[in-house]
Structure formats: C-alpha cells, structure tokens
Amino acid sequence: MSDLSVEMPKLEINNPGDFPSPLISYIKNDPTFKELLDSNNYKELYSYVSNSSTVTGQLTHLLYSLGFDPLKELTFVPRNFLSSQHYPPTYVTIPDNIEYLDVNSFAISDLTTISLPANLRYIDRFAFYYTPHLQSIEFRGTKEQWKKVRKIPDWISGASITNVKNIICKDGKVKL
C-alpha cells in the first residue's frame, strides 16, 4: 500500500482519448487554472474549480495519478473531491490534519470504506451523498469524540444510508 490517502487507478495521460475532456479544457484554455496547478496551492486550486463537480473529481484523479496527495496539504476535504469518480477507491484514509469535510466531498463516487481522523470537527451536508458502495465508516477516535463532531443534516444520505448502519470507533460502534 502506498502512502497516498486515496488509492485509485492511474489516468493514462499519454492517451488523449482516455483523458477527461472537461479537465483537459481547463488545462489547455484557462491560464488561472494552469497557474494554480503549477503553484501546488491546493486550497486555491480546489476553490477555483469547486463549482464544477466533474472537474473537481477529475482534478483529484489527476493529482493522485501523478503521485500528489492534496489532502496532506489541506485542513479540509474539498467540495466535490471525489465527485463523479467511478474508479473504485476501495479504501480512503483521511490524514490526521483534516478537520472538516466540505459539501459533497465524496458524493456520487464508488467509495467503499473510509477512515476518518480523530480530530475531525465538522461534516457538511451531502458529504456522503449517493455513495451506493459505501460499506464502512471508521472513526479513529472514541465514541465520545464522534458525538462531538458537528454533523449537518443529510451528511450521509441517498443510497449511502442503506449500507452503513454504524460508525466504527476505536472503542466500539455508534449507531447512525
């Protein structure tokens, strides 16, 4: 296992037909996007594309394909981070520096298992919206710490709530 937070198949960058067209349009035509990509300022880069869920998810896929781990440089999981990515990252480990999950962080993805840090403070709405393959949410803190995490209504919703019944904490389970 690598030390990247998200494991997913690599994009075949040498084959233009396999490269996602919405993202390639940003790369080719948007000087601000290119400048932010070159700067490795992940906070600004994700903020810049946050209104396009497809591009945001494709950006995440590109960065991990190139061996970059943006989550290690941020304190939050960006909006639409894995959105519309149907390459099953079966297990995602959110690094300890992450304090909150933004809107739609993992929405509409093939995520199956996620491990959340003990210092997580906030989960925004639809963070786990329509993740039909999600089977397990692990929290690396205690049940008491989990209860203190501020969770906006509908933080887990759609097909996600069908499979996940409990949060697995280090000292036991908490029912959803």
What do these predicted ranges mean?
Residues 1-18, 25-76, 85-100, 109-122, ...:
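Structural signature of tandem-repeat unit edges
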